[in-house]
């Protein structure tokens, strides 16, 4: 393979991260989230995904014989600002409000009364040998992959109670997601095509 263009996509990911081990771990463990993500800091073209390309991809998936439509969801993710070692950081716990009606209600009241949010803690995944399996980049294609451990938390968990404490006075980071989900017929692979509107990470609300 003398030309970068000859490299297969997955092979290119293997040059910049443990992509094959990431795939094996994701298949082996149900609580891991493996994602292919558009955009890569190592890719020379920094252009963002355009609305036109997004709609073209959606049309392809809508008419695909490999994937079938799985779901269409509206979610609002909320994380809070923390101070760690004197620096402002975003919490690794997030709450998600599901459905337009509940999202509208939250926006009116800024609390979770009569709502059914979910709580998840995310962290980078490391293998048993402590090898970092958290990310891999292509460098040739505008794509990267991440592997994270997702831990579902109960609303009475100590970490959640701390996360919610003094909620109305906390600075928050919001991400509204309109998600179109597609799944293979064998249910092994899923594509989430998601339009996202988010607040500025450097400016909390």
Model-assigned labels for residue ranges:
Residues 1-205:
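Phosphate-end processing signature that detects enzymes handling 5′-triphosphorylated RNA
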